[in-house]
Amino acid sequence: MAKSTSSAPSQRMLRVGEQVRAAITQVLQRGDVRDPLIESTVISISEVRMSPDLKLATAYVTPLGVADHAAVIEALNKHAKFIRGRLGPHLRQMKYMPDVRFRDDTSFENYQKIDSLLRSPEVSRDLDRDSDEE
């Protein structure tokens, strides 16, 4: 049986990614990470993408209420090995504990740009014109 060459994540990658996301969320909520910047910031983890071999987890995070996202991401990456160690009790079924990387989630900004474009007068005029022709 040949392996699939599609770039879409497998069901297992999605399931494990969701489990890792929940585990990281619990570690951060409990306050296990002793860093003033992380402790004082509300951090939303929107998605965790797993590598095909499940050895690397990329967590997309959005620090809420902080202007300097890069500093929070840097602090999280500085404590990534500690966080990885705290994932063990939550992910007992994993053969290997994945390395964790944190990245800034820009999807919300992209959604806002698309929304503002759709609400612009030029686009709404074109949309109104299309609906009048039907």
UniProtKB/Swiss-Prot annotation:
Q: What is this protein called?
A: Ribosome-binding factor A
- Gene3D superfamilies (UniProt xref): 3.30.300.20
Gene Ontology cellular-component terms for this entry are: cytosol
Point out the gene that encodes the protein. rbfA
Q: Where is the signal peptide?
A: none
UniProt keyword list:
Cytoplasm, Ribosome biogenesis
Functional description taken from the UniProt entry: One of several proteins that assist in the late maturation steps of the functional core of the 30S ribosomal subunit. Associates with free 30S ribosomal subunits (but not with 30S subunits that are part of 70S ribosomes or polysomes). Required for efficient processing of 16S rRNA. May interact with the 5'-terminal helix region of 16S rRNA.
Quaternary state and interactors: Monomer. Binds 30S ribosomal subunits, but not 50S ribosomal subunits or 70S ribosomes.
